[in-house]
Curated annotation (Swiss-Prot):
The keyword Hydrolase does not apply. Its EC number is 2.3.2.27. The lineage of its organism: Eukaryota, Metazoa, Chordata, Craniata, Vertebrata. Induction: By gamma irradiation and chemical mutagens but not by UV irradiation. The modification N6-acetyllysine is found at residues 122, 179, 244, 261. Gene3D superfamilies: YVTN repeat-like/Quinoprotein amine dehydrogenase (2.130.10.10), Zinc/RING finger domain, C3HC4 (zinc finger) (3.30.40.10). Residues 2-73 form the U-box domain. Pathway: Protein modification; protein ubiquitination. This is Pre-mRNA-processing factor 19. The keyword DNA repair applies. Changing residue 405 to A: Loss of interaction with the RPA complex and loss of recruitment to sites of DNA damage. GO terms for cellular component: catalytic step 2 spliceosome; cytoplasm; lipid droplet; membrane; nuclear speck; nucleoplasm; nucleus; Prp19 complex.
Length: 504
């Protein structure tokens, strides 16, 4: 009987068998393999020298080695070479199988690591955005005294007992009249000329998005619902969010100057004071809050309404606030004392108010209602002097032009109507696409351009009333739009919680 070693493929001198694989080996070769690896070379199972079983056979008589110059010698050399190749091939197959298993395991680990990295990256991004809304800026660390011209902090944040309304005293009425006279005189001096610095229509039509900021408000409660620019420095941006916060943002430094917290519901209206470091906000929590920007604190809470506050406008004097509400009243309040001077409702209508806006002169103002009416009021007499019917659906926004005689209105009927206050009639209707929503209307400071925000952002040139610009960058509904100084840029906010800027 002839035995062949599974390692050398030769007849072994001291054959033995492995009980693990049942293969025959040359003892000296298998002992060396076990010393190095401790396993059976065929199936890699653990194997020790003690487990090897010797095989007793008659020793074959080895033939004499052939001469190196004979054909048998060549055949023997080829046979030896073949044996070596086979042994090497066997080893390579074993190594290949091991490598494949290791590679498969590594690929599974890599896939799992990629998933973990993607999840952590998403969490880090959300955390950074949340941090951006909470991180105080250096300018807010040191408290500053509120100037004497600003409202007192006494009773800030506490409910106000309005008691009897103060009323429109002769002094207040005279103050309003004097301011209106000054503004009317200035408007007449300007005439129909527009500022030389104002961006021309052909330049405006080339505006494109140049910046987008999404870290102002909370990522967990997305949506910016209100927008205003500081009249004296349009680089300062004011926003109100669904996260109940009011944010003051600096466009030039791209930094949050203040995050103002205090409302218990979303913030739907915000207004910048033109000359003081004050901002105003209104919310469905039925409060109007007056904030000090340097201190990042609330200095006054005006409780003029019993239901959600839907509109907010600052009088040209900078001393009084107009507000509208779901409680069907409009209110006129003093920002210095926080007291409500007068509250009026149209008893014949019995309908909630949706928005309110002062005329540039401040002696009249407009309100929008849930039943599609635009009402013009005389502030001094507190009387409804004109009504503009024609819309269908709740009024969503109204805007007076700086020229003093144009009024733009929008409702849930996919249209914008232009009214001439001198003739008290509708002279133009901008019919938009079906299901187009309009949430914000505003004229630029010169009355040359009209911007509307809603489903998209659209810019119209007044008098011709033709669209010259259209932006669709917001992934959600646009809730606010505003012009920079001399229309050098345009800002917009949306439910995608982004603040976007457009310019050349």
């Amino acid at each position: 009987m002839s035995l062949i070693c599974s390692i050398s493929n030769e007849v072994p001198e001291h054959p033995c068998v492995s009980p693990v694989s049942n293969h025959v080996y040359e003892r000296r070769l298998i002992e060396k393999y076990i010393a190095e690896n401790g396993t059976d070379p065929i199936n890699n199972q653990p194997l020790s020298e003690e487990q090897l079983i010797d095989i007793k056979v008659a020793h074959p008589i080895r033939p004499k080695p052939p001469s190196a110059t004979s054909i048998p010698a060549i055949l023997k050399a080829l046979q030896d070479e073949w044996d070596a190749v086979m042994l090497h091939s066997f080893t390579l197959r074993q190594q290949l199988q091991t490598t494949r298993q290791e590679l498969s395991h590594a690929l599974y680990q890599h896939d799992a690591a990629c998933r973990v990295i993607a999840r952590l990256t998403k969490e880090v991004t959300a955390a950074r955005e949340a941090l951006a809304t909470l991180k105080p800026q250096a300018g807010l660390i040191v408290p500053q005294a509120v100037p004497s011209s600003q409202p007192s902090v006494v009773g800030a944040g506490e409910p106000m007992d309005l008691g009897e309304l103060v009323g429109m005293t002769p002094e207040i009425i005279q103050k309003l009249q004097d301011k209106a006279t000054v503004l009317t005189t200035e408007r007449k001096k300007r005439g129909k000329t527009v500022p030389e610095e104002l961006v021309k229509p052909e330049e405006l039509s080339k505006y494109r998005q140049v910046a987008s900021h999404v870290g102002l408000h909370s990522a967990s409660i997305p949506g910016i619902l209100a927008l205003d620019l500081c009249p004296s420095d349009t680089n300062k941006i004011l926003t109100g969010g669904a996260d109940k916060n009011v944010v003051v943002f600096d466009k030039s430094s791209e930094q949050i100057l203040a995050t103002l917290k205090g409302h218990t519901k979303k913030v739907t209206s915000v207004v910048f004071h033109p000359s003081q470091d004050l901002v105003f906000s209104a919310s469905p929590d039925a409060t109007i809050r007056i904030w000090s920007v340097p201190n990042a604190s609330c200095v006054q809470v005006v409780r003029a309404h019993e239901s959600a506050v839907t509109g907010l406008s600052l009088h040209a004097t900078g001393d009084y606030l107009l507000s509208s509400s779901d409680d069907q009243y409009w209110a006129f309040s003093d920002i210095q004392t926080g007291r409500v001077l007068t509250k009026v409702t149209d008893e014949t209508s019995g309908c909630s108010l949706t928005c309110a806006q002062f005329h540039p002169d401040g002696l009249i103002f407009g309100t929008g209602t849930m039943d599609s009416q635009i009402k013009i009021w005389d502030l001094k007499e507190r009387t409804n002097v004109a009504n503009f019917p024609g819309h269908s659906g709740p009024i969503t926004s109204i805007a007076f032009s700086e020229n003093g005689y144009y009024l733009a209105t929008a409702a849930d009927d996919s249209s914008v109507k232009l009214w001439d206050l001198r003739k008290l009639k509708n002279f133009k209707t901008l019919q938009l696409d079906n299901n187009f929503e309009v949430k914000s209307l505003i004229f630029d400071q010169s009355g040359t351009y009209l911007a509307l925000g809603g489903t998209d952002v659209q810019i119209y040139i007044c008098k011709q009333w033709t669209e010259i610009l259209h932006f669709t960058e917001h992934s959600g509904l646009t809730t606010g739009v505003a012009f920079g100084h001399h229309a050098k840029f345009i800002a917009s906010t949306g439910m995608d919680r982004s603040l976007k800027f457009y310019s050349l």
